Design a protein with these regions (language model features):
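Nucleotidyltransferase catalytic core that binds NTPs
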Residues: 1-147
Length: 147
């Protein structure tokens, strides 16, 4: 099994870590639904000869916005990374969910983080995925912004 690379800063990404086919989400628990999204990204990666990646956030956005709420997480960041490595994910983009990231509009997230920063080739998301400030970006918006 190859060792998965973990990338934590979208502003300083090596060219060798760009161009991945990526499943995007929090993947807490890495359950069968998550694995299905990852498998779709894997198939796109095979088709396009690009590495398989997962883009996730730490801390979980819910924890960031409600730091005093009771813990709801099924697994730690380290446990998630271990599980993703066992699924042969080649690159884990684990971004620090902070004020800067949480303030980006959907367009700016797609432009600054996905396109210019991480240089991702293809994104796969679950149908309930939202992104950008106030969760205002949807999958439909994502397609318009990134393509």
């Amino acid at each position: 099994m190859k060792i998965m690379r973990i990338i934590r800063d979208y502003q300083f990404v090596k060219s060798s870590d760009k161009g991945a086919s990526v499943a995007v989400g929090n993947f807490d628990g890495v359950h069968l639904g998550h694995q299905h999204v990852i498998d779709i990204a894997r198939l796109w990666g095979i088709k396009n000869k690009s590495p398989l990646g997962v883009l996730t956030f730490e801390p979980h956005p819910r924890s960031y916005f409600s730091p005093h709420a009771s813990s709801f997480r099924l697994m730690s960041s380290d446990a998630k990374a271990t599980r993703l490595n066992k699924l042969n994910v080649e690159k884990l983009y684990e971004l620090n969910f902070n004020k800067t990231l949480s303030s980006l509009t959907p367009f700016d997230f797609a432009d600054q983080v996905i396109s210019k920063g991480l240089g991702l080739r293809h994104l796969v998301v679950g149908e309930d995925f939202c992104f950008g400030k106030g969760r205002s970006g949807t999958v439909k918006e994502d397609r318009k912004s990134v393509v």
